[in-house]
Each structure stands twice: as C-alpha cells, then as structure tokens.
C-alpha cells in the first residue's frame, strides 16, 4: 500500500476594511488560493480481440495498465478531464506459448466543482485503482476476446492566484486605540510553472536480463522541497534470465528538477506521457521518460491582520502645534510618523511633496496637525 494524503481545512475569517474616523493601513499580497480539492472516478469496460484466428487464450499471466491525462479544461463550476490508457497483457495460448497484446482506449469525465472559473489552474493525478481482466469467448465461441473492467481515480486541486488586501495597522487621531488582531498562514508571491521534460534513469539488476517479457513505469509520488520538484519513478518488469527462468524486478528511483534558485515551498503534479527503455548491458536498463508537470512555488508567510479597532481614551494633545518640525531617518515610514503625531499621513506627504511612503534619505519634515 502506497498512500499520499493531503488534508485541507477551509477557514473563514474577517478583516477590518473601514471604520469611521480611523486610518487603516492595508498590505496587498499575491496569494495562492487552493479553492477546491477532491477525488472523482471514471469507470471503464472494454472488450477487444486478439486478432489472431489460430490463437486462443489459455490463461492470463500478467497485466499492466498506463493512464495519462491527455487534456483538461476548466469552465464555470465544471472541469473536463480526458484520459488515455494503454493495457499490456501477457497471456499463454492454447499451445503453451506466451504472447503479449497491447490495447489503447480513451475515456473522459466532467467533474462538478463549485466556484471554479476558466482562469483557475488545476493539478491532476490519475491512476487506475481497480482492474479486472478476463478472457471472453467471441462470436465463434473461441477464447479470443479479452474484457477489461476497472476504475480510474482522478484526484485534483483547483488553484487560483489572487490579490488579497490585509489591514495590518490602524489608529484614530487624538485617541488611544486598541486593535484586535488575528493571524493567518498564506502562500504568498506564487510562481506558476507548466512545461514538458524528457529525462533518463538507470536501473541495475543483480541478475542477467536476456529478454524483457513485460515492463511498466509509474510516477508514484510528487513533492516540492526547496524549489526542487521530486518525483518517485517505479520501474517493474518480468524478464527471462540466462536459465530461461521467469523473474520479476521492481525498483524505485527519484528524479529531481530544480525550478528556482530561491528556496521556496510548492505544490506540483506530474503526468507521465510515455516511456521506453534500452538494455544497456545484461544487468542494466536505461529508462527514458517524457512528462509534463504543473507546479506552484510560493513563500509560506504568517501575516497578522486587524479584525477590529476600538478607542480607550482621548489623548491630551490640546497644546500640540499646527506645524511641527521632525527629523526623519532614512527608510522611516510616513505612516509611522503620522501615527505618532496623531495626524494624517496624506497631509505630511502633501506638505513635503513626497512621492513615497518611505523616506529615502535623512531629512527634516513639516508635520501638520489635525
């Protein structure tokens, strides 16, 4: 059993947006929002023929199946997912010889997802979770047909990049104020990646490989650590050794792809498009794979924001002059200066003809009162 479990909790909260007589400082952030997650399924029932009139199926030796996402499209409240599948079946015929047949088919599913939009992004993982294969008699009453029944599990995440505004500071002039705050963990400054990639992995065996009977490769799991996309590739195959014995091989290797030089966290999905192999020598196989991947890199950030503000007492500032000289430091915020003088930051900016909220050099400011 190999399980990868992601748990998401939807949190509803509120942020102070306006208050009479209060000045509110907002901070805008680009945020990766995971709008929906879920698992759907696609059932299939395929019947196909061997295409060889002189051959009947005695028994089925092994079955592999590949499944890849060929297309995906989001419209309002729905997502279309198209899947391409390939069955590889090794069987024994009536004369006792083994043979192999491959069969390709396509299927699709429309998934209902509330509140998703065409501008959203999707990360999809599709894999066969149930498969039952059996020989079946054809119209001539011969065991020359195969029926494959199964289910494909389609897990998905729907994401969007949104600009969110957070109230991070507030005050009411001439009053001592108390702010109620809360904290929220956000995925800020997201970077979107979508691309295709071909690469090669080498697998070594401790026995000689004379002939590959059947081979299968799968992407087992995907994660992002320090801006590096990691995917575990499982290779498994049946082969004949030097003594013509049927043997089984299974091994997992990790493929890593650096997405960014800045270390960030991320979400990703990998779709295996196709693969082939070359026997390098009697005990080594080079597996060549083509994938496409979807990834988001982001910075985990805990932001403290204001939910409410209240006054405690009125300040005794009756003797405060209408215009005050203030020696501002480099990189000091006009907002912080206005808050300390219980005035409006816009008055300071206009009075001193400033172009930014941050003071770029040490200077004298005229601070108007209110």
What is each of the regions a protein language model found here?
Residues 311-350, 355-370:
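Primarily a LysM-type cell-wall glycan-binding module
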Residues 1-319:
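Interfacial loop/beta elements and low-complexity acidic/Ser/Thr-rich segments
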